[in-house]
Amino acid sequence: DDLRIAYSEHALFAPFREGWSFQLRLANRRSTMLVEAEARLMLVMADVDDQGELLNYYNLKLQLDRVSFLPLSWTLVHPIDGDSPLAGISYDEMVQRRAEVILVLKGTDEGYMQQVITRHSYRYDEMVWGARYIRAFSARKGSMQLDLDKLSDHQRVEAPERMPNGQGVLA
């Protein structure tokens, strides 16, 4: 992990608009800005067939996958809709299939004009089923301040046993 990027300790299955989403938070610890930041999430899950175990890889489409600049923090949101590989899944299935979500973040350090690529992952036991992040900002002296100690803060919310299957129906 790149020590200049901070990541939330847990990724969350969180309410989003009228449905649910998979979310994680990251923050820029640098004194310089990260520009043209781009994020990709990949879900890896194990399946068993007659040949044995195999790993399946799925792209998780983000609500917003790039920002022109990352001055403070960014909450990455994958809406769980009918096209999501997480549609209809339960937490027990995530555990059984040893789910892991891998984040790849690319950007350019504005101060040094040097490309930054960093990876971070969340295993099933680092995911919280039914929670939402608590705001990590406060307004001080007329400007927004990020409190890195609050980057991972979340509160539990009631969640369905399974994520919606995309038809607005719980599977």
Regions picked out by a protein language model, each given a short descriptive name:
Residues 1-56:
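Canonical alpha-helical transmembrane segment with a positive-inside/aromatic-interface signature
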Residues 96-100:
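Extracellular Ig-like/FN3 beta-sandwich strand-entry sites
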Residues 48-51, 64-69, 81-85, 141-150:
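Noncatalytic linker/hinge segments flanking ATPase motor cores
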Residues 10-15, 29, 44-46, 106-110, ...:
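Generic structural motif
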Residues 45-48, 61-73, 122-136:
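Short, surface-exposed linear segments at secondary-structure transitions and domain or protein termini
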Residues 111-171:
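Acidic, serine/threonine- and proline-rich intrinsically disordered appendage/tail regions
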Residues 55-95, 107-114:
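Extended, solvent-exposed segments with strong compositional bias
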